[in-house]
């Protein structure tokens, strides 16, 4: 009798715990999470240390590296929580996925307008250079980069990564090996692109402080580089979720959003290559 009581008690308590964790409504109610404030603090460290590095402070580069490590770590942990909520706790119902899709599309639209503001600043100076710039673009004394060397190579690399991620998208879910190989190829190409971008920055004949050309160039390409870093993390999380059998025919929203984000990064780079490297140089 006592064993039966204990068994019923355990069953009732387990049922209560499961009912608390399983979502019974279609609304996206987020739980308390430390990651938004952690990501915000990491971005603050990256911003401040970036300014310190530009100003020549001795510990600026160290703090910048520390900030990037903190940003990548907190984003990874945040992705882990989102995967748990969507895959194991059932929080991402079809209604919630609709809302998340709309929110992500609006986020990409806001990013489009951010890049429009950067291109606006570039073309504002390039189309009507002032007397202080020598009434000429590029400004007098600026030695620009050859667009047919590293920039062209990076263009080929990034477009190739767009092709491999599209292959992974179309391989899902019937060809799991194709998804894995496509994502691995995309991540490798993204890493190579970032490496060449850093090589280009290191060997560039001008700096961020070299007038409006240097500031707009590094702002445009650097902000795009940050998006490449975020997209690489996004795709890496998608790869780990594929390897962990998290994705199904009807439940792979994060995977699709990562692909959409990567295509956005591809398109922005094409505009950067044509306008900043080729036409503006």
UniProtKB/Swiss-Prot annotation:
Gene Ontology MF terms in the entry: cytochrome-c oxidase activity
Catalytic EC class: translocase
A single cellular component GO annotation: mitochondrial inner membrane
Entry EC number(s): 7.1.1.9
CDD domains: Cyt_c_Oxidase_III
Any one Pfam family match given in the protein's UniProt record, by short name: COX3
Subcellular location: Mitochondrion inner membrane
Transmembrane feature ranges: 34-54, 59-79, 103-123, 148-168, 179-199, 220-240, 259-279
UniProt entry keywords in alphabetical sequence: Membrane, Mitochondrion, Mitochondrion inner membrane, Translocase, Transmembrane, Transmembrane helix
Entry membrane topology: Multi-pass membrane protein
Predominant place of localization: mitochondrion
UniProt-listed GO biological process terms: mitochondrial electron transport, cytochrome c to oxygen
UniProt key word Calcium: no
Catalytic activity field: 4 Fe(II)-[cytochrome c] + O2 + 8 H(+)(in) = 4 Fe(III)-[cytochrome c] + 2 H2O + 4 H(+)(out)
Keyword Lyase among UniProt keywords: no
Similarity field: Belongs to the cytochrome c oxidase subunit 3 family.
Function: Component of the cytochrome c oxidase, the last enzyme in the mitochondrial electron transport chain which drives oxidative phosphorylation. The respiratory chain contains 3 multisubunit complexes succinate dehydrogenase (complex II, CII), ubiquinol-cytochrome c oxidoreductase (cytochrome b-c1 complex, complex III, CIII) and cytochrome c oxidase (complex IV, CIV), that cooperate to transfer electrons derived from NADH and succinate to molecular oxygen, creating an electrochemical gradient over the inner membrane that drives transmembrane transport and the ATP synthase.
SUBUNIT field: Component of the cytochrome c oxidase (complex IV, CIV), a multisubunit enzyme composed of a catalytic core of 3 subunits and several supernumerary subunits. The complex exists as a monomer or a dimer and forms supercomplexes (SCs) in the inner mitochondrial membrane with ubiquinol-cytochrome c oxidoreductase (cytochrome b-c1 complex, complex III, CIII).
Designated name of the protein: Cytochrome c oxidase subunit 3
């Amino acid at each position: 009798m006592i064993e039966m009581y204990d068994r019923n008690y355990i069953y009732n308590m387990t049922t209560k715990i499961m009912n608390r964790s399983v979502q019974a409504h279609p609304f996206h109610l987020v739980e308390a999470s430390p990651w938004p404030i952690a990501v915000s603090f990491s971005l603050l460290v990256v911003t401040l240390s970036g300014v310190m590095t530009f100003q020549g402070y001795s510990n600026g580069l160290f703090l910048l590296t520390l900030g990037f490590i903190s940003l990548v770590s907190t984003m990874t942990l945040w992705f882990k929580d989102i995967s748990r909520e969507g895959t194991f706790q059932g929080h991402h119902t079809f209604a919630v996925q609709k809302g998340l899709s709309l929110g992500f599309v609006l986020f990409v639209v806001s990013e489009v307008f951010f890049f429009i503001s950067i291109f606006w600043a570039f073309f504002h100076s390039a189309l009507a250079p002032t007397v202080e710039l020598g009434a000429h673009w590029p400004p007098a004394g600026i030695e620009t980069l050859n667009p047919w060397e590293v920039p062209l190579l990076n263009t080929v690399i990034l477009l190739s990564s767009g092709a491999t991620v599209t292959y992974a998208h179309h391989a899902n879910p019937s060809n799991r090996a194709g998804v894995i190989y496509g994502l691995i190829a995309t991540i490798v190409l993204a890493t190579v692109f970032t490496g060449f971008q850093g090589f280009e920055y290191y060997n560039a004949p001008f700096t961020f402080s070299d007038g409006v050309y240097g500031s707009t160039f590094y702002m445009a390409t650097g902000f795009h580089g940050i998006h490449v870093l975020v997209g690489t993390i996004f795709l890496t999380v998608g790869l780990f979720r594929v390897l962990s059998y998290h994705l199904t025919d009807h439940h792979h929203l994060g995977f699709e959003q990562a692909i959409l984000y990567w295509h956005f990064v591809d398109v922005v780079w094409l505009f950067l290559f044509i306008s900043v490297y080729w036409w503006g140089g």
